[in-house]
C-alpha cells in the first residue's frame, strides 16, 4: 500500500517516528487510518481519476475501526473541544482514509468509500510533537486547546463552505462529469495500449465499472450536500458498509473549522498523535466534507474563500506559537471536490508555518506535477491523443490562494521543508526526534515524522495564490515512496507501479494511468505519474497535496529553492507532512476563495501547460526525466508503430541507449593505466587471440596496448587521454550487429598488429604506414548497419544515394572516422603537421575503401602483378601492399583456430541471413551467398576460402613469407576441413541431381553434374539428355552438339568443342563445369569467383582452384562469392562512368579487348550498348551498363574502377560489366525489360553468336562459332550491330549444323537472362552434332517441341550447366530457374536456360518447321548487336527450323532478367557474351550459326510461348579462352 509516502496515522509516520508512533498508536491509528481510509477511499474512488492519494498510513484497520477510533479520538482529545477533537480526528481519519482508500482502492469496498471521500479526502495525519520531546504527551494538552479553536474555526468554515458548495454544486458536478468522462477516455486508451503490449504492466484500478460508479458518486455527492452523510457513506463503504457517525460528525466539525483543526493539529503532541491520528481522521472526514462543500462553492466563491483563507491563515499563523510548542505533521490530501475539506485539513494542519510549507510545497508540487503532466501531454499529443490531462483541473484561485499562503508561510515552509527534507529520514525513523529537530529550525513546524495522505491536486496556497508549480517530476523519480503520496511516482523499471497503482486514487485517475502507460511503454524505466498529475482541481486539498509535493520535491521556485527533493522517501514524507499542514491551512483558505476555478478544466490545462513550460526549464531533474522518457519513447519501435512518436524508426542495429557505454567507459578509465601481463601481450600477437574472452573495457584497453607496444604514442606524440577518448568514441560508434561490431574491429586490428609484429612491418613500411594501417583497421567498419553494399545499393538506401552506389559503406566508415577526428578531444593526429595529416587521411581512406569486396579482384590482380617487382621505395607499391594487408586482416578469421573462427562464421551467417530475409521482405534481389535456402556453411566456406581468401593470403605470402606459418597454413587447413564437409554434401547433392536433374539444376548447391544436367534431348519430350563428354560431334556435346556445348560450354569444362580439356570434367563438375570453365580456371580469381571478375591471373593461378570441390564452383548463384556479387552489384553502379574504356585492354564498346586474356566474366563488358546503361524496370541507374567498362589496368584504383593490370586482368575488372547484373539486381525489373519488344538486329559479330540474316551461311557462322569456341572467336568482342531482325520462317536455319545457328527466332528481347554461364548449349559443337534438330549446341533437336515444361527444365539444366555459378541470378532462379524474364517461357524466361528447350517449340516450331514469327527465342546471347528495347540488347535467337537454337549474342546477357538474384550478372565470367562481347565464346557462337537471325521477322518483345525453346548461345569459355567448339 502506498502507506509509505502517505500519511499513516501520525503515529505511523515514516521512519522510526512512524514506527514508534505506529507502535504507540497502532490500534488506534490503525482504526483511525481505516476510518480515514474508508472516507478517503470513497472519495479517492470518485476522485481516483482526478487526484492521487498517497497513503502513508500503515494502518489497515477497517473503516469501522477508524471511525471508532475517530470517535475515540474526539473523546480522547486532550483539552480539545469536541469540535477540535473532531477536527483532529477528521484530519487523522482523512489521512488514514486516504492511505486506506489508496490501499483499499483495490477492494470494491474501498473503492466505494474512496468514491465518496475522494473529493473530500484529505489525510491530515498530524503528529503532534513537542519540539523538545519525541512524544507529544505534554503537547497533547496544548493540542487540546488548539483543537478547540480548530473545531470552532472548522465549524464556522464548514458552514461557509457548505454554502459555497451549494452554489458551486451544479458547476462542480458538471466539471466532475466532464473530468471523469475525459479520464475514462484516457483510461480506455490506456487499456487499449495494454492490449497491444504484453509487457505493458499497467494496473488500471479504474475499470469501466469503477469509473461509472465514480461518476455516479459524483452525481450523488453533488446531489447530497450533507458532507457528513457523504463521508459517512464513504466510510461505510470503506468499512464494508459499517456506518460511522462519529467520523462524519468529526468531519462536519472539521469542515466547520478547518483552521481550528489545523491549529489543534499543530498543537497536538506526539503523545496525542495516536489520538491525533484518530482526530485527524475525524478532521479529515470533516475536511473532506468541507472540501466537498468548498469544491461546490470554490468555483463561485473562490474569492470569498480567499478571505476565509486569510482568516484561516491568520488563525494558523496564530496557531504557530502553539505549533511551535507542539510540532505536528499533517498530510492533507484534498480532492478537487473536497477543496474545502482540503482547505480545512490544511487549516487543521498544525501551524501557519506548516500551512506555509504545505502551500509552498503544493505550489511547488503543482509545478512539478505540471511537469509530470507535461509528460502525458507529450506522449499523447504526439500520439494525437489530445486528452492532454484535460482531466486535471486546477483551481487557479485556490492555487493562487495557496500560493499566497505559501508566500506568507514561505519562510516557515522553507525551514520546514528543509528541515523536514533533511529530517524526513530521521523523522520517519524517529518521529519525536525529528519533530524536535524540525521544531527547532521552525517552531511552527510540526513534527514532520507524521505521515499524511495527500492527493496530488493543486491546492490553493494558504495565501490564496495559485500554485505556481506542480510537483517536480524529479521529486517523483527521486523518491518513489514519498512521491507516492503526491504522485505515486514509481519507476516502472521495477514494476512497482503494478503493486502501487491499485491503490492510487487521484482526480486525474486515468490521466495518471496515461502516464503509467507512457512510462510502461517507455520500458517502464521512467517515473510513473500515477493518477494525480497534480490534479487540475485547484482544491485546497490539491494545494495541500501540492504543498506536500513541493515540500517533498523541494521548495517552490519562488518559495524556497532550498527545499530540495530528497532521494529518500522519508524526506519526502516529512516534507510532505509539513507541506500537508500548510496545505491544509492553505486548503482551508483556498477553499474559501479558490473554488472558482473548480470547473474550469480548460483554463486549468492552460495553466498547467504554462507551469509545465516554466518548470520544465527550471527543473533540471525533471528535464532529465523527460528527456529520458522521450528517448525511450522515441527509440521504442512499438511506440513509433503506435505513432506515439513522430520520430522515424532508427536502424534496427542502432543502439538505443548509452548506459552500457558509460559503464564501459568508466571501467576502461579505471584500468587504462594498468599494464597487461607479458603473457597477455604475447597472446595479443597471435591469431589465436579470442576477443570474446575479454570485456568491452578490456578490449579497448587492449587496443591502447597495441599503440603502446608499437611505440606510436611516443613516436607521434599522441596524447594518451586523447587516444583513450578516441578509442571510446570508436567503441560507441560500432553497432550491435552480429558480425560487424566492435569486436570485429578489434579482431581486424589485432590481426594487423600480429602481422605487423610478425612481419616486422615497422621496418618494412615505416611507423607512419603502420599507424595508418592500425587506425584504418580500427575504423574500417564504423557504424556498420549489418547490411552490406549489395543491400545498400539495391535498396537505394541513404548511403547508396549519398555515395552514388560507390562503396557506400566504406565511404560511410571513412566519413564517420574523420568526423570523430574532428573533435579535438578525439583527434589523435592533432600533433601532426597538415601535410602529414593529409597523408594519413589519404592512407586511411585508401585502406578503408580497399575493404570493399567489390574491389577484391582488382586489388589482388594489381598486387600480383607488382609482386615480382615489388619495390618498398615505390609509393604505389606500398599503397597497394597496405590495401592487401588490411584486406587480409579484414577477412582473417579463418586464419584463427577453429574454436575462435567458428563462432565468427556463425555470426557472419546470422548477419547474412538477416540481410537475405530483409531483401526478401522488401522485394529486393536476394544475395545468393546470403540466402539460407541456397548456401551451406561448408560450401560457402570452401568457395570463400578457396576463391577469395586463400589466393589473397598466398599472394601476400609470396611477398611476405614470414606470414606463411602465421596465417596461410591455418587457412589451408581450414579449407581442407570445409572441403571435406562440403564433399559429403556435394556427393549427396549429386546423387539427388542424377535422380532429378531439372530439380537439381534449380538447387543452389550445384549438385547437378554437368553429366547429370540433362540437356533436353532433340525429342523435346525427353527432358533429360545425359551429356556424355564425348558424345556428339562436339566433344562436350551430349545428345546435341548443343548438349555438348551446354555441358561443355556451359560447364566451361568439356566445352562443346571439347577444345577445353575440361570438357571431360564437366560431367563431374556440375557447377564447376558450368561455373568455371577451364579457361576461367586458368585465372584463379576468375575461377575463384565466377561472378567476380576473375582476376585472371596471367598464369594459371586458376590451377590452385582446380581442386575446389565440384560444388564449390562459383559459377552458380548459390556458389557465387561475396566478391562476385559485390563486383557485379557495384560494377553496374561504379561503372556509371560508363563502359568507358577504362581498361586499356578492352573498351566495353569494343569487346575487342582480348577476351581470351580475360575469361568473359560477368565482369566482361556486356556492353552491347557500348557502355550504355540499361535502366532497370525500376529505372534504377543500376541498370547495369551492358557495357560496364572494365576498369583499365592503367586506371587508378578508383572506387569505381577495378583496373586490372592487363586486359586479361581486366577480367576481374571486366566484372565491371555486370551486364546481366542489372538484371541480376532487379530481376523483376529486368523482366519488364524482357517483356519489352526488341528489335533484334542481326549482330554482325564475328562470333558465330552474331546473328546474321538468314542469308548468312550457317557454315560461316559455324566456323565463327568454332573459332570463338576455340577462344578464337573475336577476341575483340565486336559489338554486334544492332539490326532489327525479322525472322523469316527459318526452318532452313535449323538445318545449319549448329543448333545454335538454328534459325534464330526473333528474340523478344525477353532474353532469358542467360547467365554468362548460359552458354547456349547450342554453342556450336564442332561436329555440329545433329545440326538438324538439336544439333549444335542446343542439344535440343531443333524441331522437337517438347512440352513447355520439358524445354523449360532443359533450359534450366543448360543454364545450370552453362551458367557459371556466377549466374547468381540464374541460379537464383535456379540458374536455370527461369530468370525473371516474365515473358520467356522457359528458356526464354531464363537466361540460364541456355536455349534449353529450344528444341521444344511447342508452338510447333518443328524442326525445320518455320518458326512462328511471333515466337521469340529469347536467347541471351550477349550479342550486343541485337537491340533490345527494354533491356535486352541484342540477343538474337536463331530459330532453326525446328530446332530453335537460341543464339543471342552476348548483349542479351544483360537482358537476362535473372535479375532477381544479386547473383552474378547474367553473364558468366566465361560467357563473354555476358560480358557484352557477343562474339565471346559465351555466345556460343551459335549465333553465328543459324543464329544469324533471319531478318524479316521483327521481334516484338513478347513472351516467348513456352513452345519456343530458346537456346542460350553463350560460349562457356571466357573469351580469353577459346570457346568450346560445337
UniProtKB/Swiss-Prot annotation:
- Binding of Mg(2+) occurs at 781
The record ties this protein, via Pfam families, to:
PDEase_I (PF00233)
Residues annotated to bind 3',5'-cyclic GMP? 740-744, 781, 890
The record's EC number reads: 3.1.4.35
**Can you quote the record's cofactor note?**
Binds 1 Zn(2+) ion per subunit. Binds 2 divalent metal cations per subunit: site 1 preferentially binds zinc, while site 2 has a preference for magnesium. Tightly binds zinc.
Annotated region Disordered: the residues are: 1-48, 266-348, 393-476, 986-1170, 1265-1284, 1314-1351, 1372-1406, 1469-1496
This protein's pathway: Purine metabolism; 3',5'-cyclic GMP degradation; GMP from 3',5'-cyclic GMP: step 1/1
Which residues are Zn(2+)-binding? Answer: 744, 780-781, 890
List compositional bias (Low complexity) regions by residue number: 1-43, 324-348, 401-440, 993-1005, 1139-1148, 1314-1324, 1341-1350, 1375-1397
User: Where in the sequence is the active site?
Assistant: 740 (proton donor)
Alphabetized InterPro entries for the sequence: HD/PDEase_dom, PDEase, PDEase_catalytic_dom, PDEase_catalytic_dom_sf, PDEase_CS
Q: Which GO terms describe its biological process?
A: cAMP-mediated signaling; cGMP catabolic process; cyclic nucleotide metabolic process
Q: Which cofactor does it need?
A: Zn(2+); Mg(2+)
The entry lists its GO molecular-function terms as:
3',5'-cyclic-AMP phosphodiesterase activity; 3',5'-cyclic-GMP phosphodiesterase activity; 3',5'-cyclic-nucleotide phosphodiesterase activity; metal ion binding
Q: Where do Gly residues bias regions lie?
A: 1033-1057, 1325-1340
Biased composition (Basic and acidic residues) is annotated at 270-282, 305-314, 1125-1136
Q: In which tissues is it expressed?
A: Expressed in Malpighian tubules and adult fly head.
User: Which reaction is recorded as catalysed by this protein?
Assistant: 3',5'-cyclic GMP + H2O = GMP + H(+)
Which keywords has UniProt assigned to this entry?
cGMP, Hydrolase, Magnesium, Metal-binding, Zinc
**Residues in PDEase domain copies:** 664-985
* Chain intervals with Polar residues compositional bias: 441-462, 1065-1093, 1470-1486
Q: What does this protein do?
A: Specifically hydrolyzes the second messenger cGMP, which is a key regulator of many important physiological processes. Highly specific: compared to other members of the cyclic nucleotide phosphodiesterase family, has the highest affinity and selectivity for cGMP.
Family, per entry: Belongs to the cyclic nucleotide phosphodiesterase family. PDE9 subfamily.
**PANTHER family, sorted:** CYCLIC NUCLEOTIDE PHOSPHODIESTERASE
Q: What is this protein called?
A: High affinity cGMP-specific 3',5'-cyclic phosphodiesterase 9A
Instruction: Provide the species name.
Output: Drosophila melanogaster (Fruit fly)
